[in-house]
Structure formats: structure tokens, C-alpha cells
UniProtKB/Swiss-Prot annotation:
It comes from Escherichia coli O157:H7. Thought to be a D-serine dehydratase, however it does not complement a dsdA (D-serine dehydratase) mutant in strain CFT073, suggesting it may not have that function. GO terms for molecular function: L-cysteine desulfhydrase activity. InterPro entries: Ser_deHydtase-like_asu, UPF0597. One of its GO terms (biological process) is L-cysteine catabolic process to pyruvate. This is UPF0597 protein YhaM. Induction: 40-fold induced under conditions that maximally induce expression of the large pathogenicity island (PAI) also called the locus of effacement (LEE); part of the dlsT-yhaM operon. Slightly induced by D-serine. The lineage of its organism: Bacteria, Pseudomonadati, Pseudomonadota, Gammaproteobacteria, Enterobacterales. Disruption phenotype: No effect on protein secretion by the type III secretion system (T3SS) encoded in the locus of effacement (LEE). Pfam families: SDH_alpha. Belongs to the UPF0597 family.
């Protein structure tokens, strides 16, 4: 798989990116439930007649208001129904990519007949949890996903247990690539990006290909809040400058518009999120195009952006009250700063300013308005880069920003991991009261 001469740590970096940067069709929380339903349906004897599902509060939060691709409908029930009736159990986050018009119609009919239920799992100590149980008469199959959007931990049917994930790691087995990131630094990541052979990271260019296609679709103006298309229109009217700053925001938000509005195109995700993948990709692509960067230079910038985003997000809960478009945009700031001058000091200053700027943005569930937060984060990232180029940044004397960028990141992640847990509960309570 790798050149045997490649630094073992760099191999783990590459594996971490390959593990966390994947194509995903549709918002990944509903898609996680759709995958559970699809795998359960594949285990069931006979066609699915009824679907029951249970999810964690966080997954419910991120599934209430987002459009499921191809359906024109929002919410977890349609995701569960379509996963069960038209999902590809072997396609991971692209579980709905082969869903036919007939499968969509059948899923809607199942919903209309009252044969689909989705409830919050109680009690639930997991942040990311989805369980789907499908029925054919008295026969049933049940699949549980925990911890990661595609991490199936249990499969069971009316005949007994089919699969249970072993919790322990076998002796001599290598640790997860993400575990390596807990012991690395941004400086080491930058060294990797500067020195790794281009051939070893060429694959990251696929993120530009997928997310640029999504952005172009978003500019059609028919998806979500059509923020990208609206801002582009205001450029034509002379109300917004046609410059690099506006291009970064327009093209990034357009991809999120299409993503959240239900376009049937995959996003290249990051850390289990399409919007994080878009945010880590599109600003870097726009700046690379501005400077006429070749494929190798673009790949290195994208690798820095995506790996930095993963590095920061790895210190957070998988889902939390902190909008992770902000942390993905910190990766984008690193990638853009690298394209402009490549200095570690510029990169670290840009990230510190980002932490001093958008770190309080909450996640109130996946919805069309995520594109607003994506556009804000992308804009803040470029602003932070411009400030860093002028040797200006939020300093360690201000707020949660420390004198060292690593400590600044740790402070932000501690806030999200601990204090913001109550914020998350309040958000879920507010959203649940709206749904009643």
C-alpha cells in the first residue's frame, strides 16, 4: 500500500486522512441511520414491511431538519425508510447512491402508512448511536451503529446474533491512525506536508473534484438557502465586490447549499461530516486557483487543511454543541496560509485568530442554515490569513487564546468537550419542544 521507505508516522497520517476523508451522499447523521436500516434489510428474510429506529439525542438533533437526497423530504424517518427499501448495504456513507425512483416512492408510502418510527434511545450514553430494526411479519433484523457513522457494532435477527464487534484490540494489532494524532503537533503535520512524496497524497485531489462539482450545482440557485447563488447575484448587481474574498465565500457556501438542500451528488467529507469536508476543501481550492497552483501544490495545501481539521476535531466529541465547520475552517486557514507563504508562524497565527473569532458558534442541528455557518467560517478563515500575513493575530492575552497555538486548540476543545455539554442539552430540549 505504501512505499516501504515512507516514514511510518507519515503512513499513519495518510491512513488517518483516508479513514476520515470519504465520499458521503447526504447529511451523515441521517445517512448513518439509513445505513443501519439498509444492513438490517439485507439480513431480513423477505421484504421490509415495518421499520423501527432509535437514535442518540445528538443524532436526532442533526437529523430533524435536513433534506434526504432525492426525496425532497427532511428528517430521520424518510432516511430510515429509504435505507431499508432502497439502500446499498455495502456503500457506507453512500448508502443511498443507488436508490431508485420506485424505492423512494415505496419509502414515502411506508411513511404514509405509519409503518416507520424513530425515537430517542433512552438511556443513551453514546454521542453517536443509531439502531434500526426492520420487520417482515414476525421476522426481524436489527443493526446498531455506535461511535462512528459507519461503525456497525451489532447485527441480530430473530434467529440470533449475527455479528458483535469485539471491543478489545488484539495483541500486536496496530493502533488507530487517529490515536497517533493525539501525540502529534501542527509543526509535525506541516513537515509531513512539505516533504511527503506527491504520489503518496495525490488521492486528496479527489476532495477538490467532488466538492467543486457540488459547489457548481449549488450555484444553480435551486438548493437550500441558495446563499452562494444569492451572493453571486449581488456581485452582478454591484452590491458585493467580485474578488478573491467573495469567491471563497460564494463557492464554499454554494457547495453546502447543495449538500444540505438534498442534491444527489456526494460530498467529500471530513471527520464524518460533508460540511466539514466542504469547508476544509473549497476555500483552499479557490485560493489555489487564484495563484495558479499546480496539482502538487494544491494536493499539499489540501492535505494540510484536511489533516489539520482532523487533528483538531480528534480532540472533540464526534458530535457536540460546537459547530465543527469552524474547526474545519481552521484547517482551511492553514491550507490557504501555506499557499500564500508557507510559514508555520503564519499558519499558527491564522488558527489562533480563528479561535478568537468563531469559536462560540453553536451547532443547532443539521439544516439548510448550516450553509450560513459554513460561509461565515470560510470568511473568517481568509480574514485570519490576511491578518497573519500582516503579522497580526489574536494574542495569548485575550480570551481562550493562548500564547501557543497547540494550547489554544486544547482550550477550545476543552470548552466543547465539557462546558458546552449543557449547551448541547439545552439545544436538544429546544428543538424537541419544536418537534412536538
Amino acid at each position: 500500500m505504501f512505499d516501504s521507505t515512507l516514514n511510518p508516522l507519515w503512513q499513519r497520517y495518510i491512513l488517518a486522512v483516508q479513514e476520515e476523508v470519504k465520499p458521503a451522499l447526504g447529511c451523515t447523521e441521517p445517512i448513518s441511520l439509513a445505513l443501519a436500516a439498509a444492513v438490517a434489510a439485507a439480513e431480513l428474510e423477505g421484504p421490509v414491511e415495518r421499520v423501527e429506529a432509535w437514535v442518540s439525542p445528538n443524532l436526532m438533533k442533526n437529523g430533524l431538519g435536513v433534506t434526504v437526497p432525492g426525496t425532497g423530504m427532511v428528517g430521520l424517518p424518510i432516511a430510515a425508510a429509504l435505507g431499508a427499501l432502497g439502500g446499498n448495504a455495502n456503500a457506507g456513507l453512500e448508502v443511498l447512491k443507488d436508490a431508485t425512483a420506485q424505492a423512494i416512492a415505496d419509502a414515502k408510502a411506508l411513511l404514509a402508512a405509519g409503518k416507520v418510527s424513530v425515537k430517542i434511545q433512552e438511556p443513551c450514553n453514546e454521542i453517536l448511536f443509531s439502531r434500526a430494526k426492520v420487520w417482515n411479519g414476525e421476522k426481524w433484523a436489527c443493526v446498531t451503529i455506535v461511535g462512528g457513522h459507519t461503525n456497525i457494532v451489532h447485527i441480530e435477527t430473530h434467529d440470533g446474533v449475527v455479528f458483535t464487534q469485539q471491543a478489545c484490540v488484539a495483541e500486536g494489532e496496530q493502533e488507530s491512525p487517529l490515536s497517533v494524532l493525539s501525540r502529534t503537533t501542527l509543526a509535525e503535520i506541516l513537515k509531513f506536508v512539505n516533504e511527503v512524496p506527491f504520489a503518496a497524497i495525490r488521492f486528496i485531489l479527489d476532495s477538490a473534484k467532488l466538492n467543486c462539482a457540488l459547489s457548481q450545482e449549488g450555484l444553480s440557485g435551486k438548493w437550500g438557502l441558495h446563499i452562494g447563488a444569492t451572493l453571486e447575484k449581488q456581485c452582478e448587481r454591484g452590491l458585493l465586490a467580485k474578488d478573491l474574498s467573495s469567491s471563497i465565500v460564494i463557492r464554499t457556501s454554494a457547495a453546502s447549499d447543495a449538500r444540505m438542500g438534498g442534491a444527489t451528488l456526494p460530498a467529500m467529507s471530513n471527520s464524518g461530516s460533508g460540511n466539514q469536508g466542504i469547508t476544509a476543501t473549497m476555500p483552499v481550492v479557490v485560493v489555489a486557483e487564484h495563484f495558479g497552483a499546480d496539482d502538487e501544490r494544491l494536493a499539499r495545501a489540501l492535505m494540510l487543511s484536511h489533516l489539520s481539521a482532523i487533528y483538531i476535531h480528534n480532540q472533540l466529541p464526534r458530535l457536540s454543541a460546537l459547530c465543527a465547520a469552524t474547526t474545519a475552517a481552521m484547517g482551511a486557514a492553514a491550507g490557504m496560509a501555506w499557499l500564500v507563504d508557507g510559514r508555520y508562524e503564519t499558519i499558527s497565527m491564522a488558527i489562533s485568530s480563528m479561535i478568537g473569532d468563531v469559536s462560540g458558534m453553536i451547532c443547532d442541528g443539521a439544516s439548510n442554515s448550516c450553509a450560513m455557518k459554513v460561509s461565515t467560517s470560510a470568511s473568517a478563515a481568509w480574514k485570519a490569513v490576511l491578518m497573519a500575513l500582516d503579522d497580526t493575530a489574536v494574542t495569548g492575552n485575550e480570551g481562550i487564546v493562548a500564547h501557543d497555538v497547540e494550547q489554544s486548540i486544547a482550550n477550545l476543545c476543552a470548552l466543547a468537550s465539557h462546558s458546552m455539554q449543557q449547551t448541547d442539552r439545552q439545544i436538544i430540549e429546544i428543538m424537541a419542544s419544536k418537534a412536538r
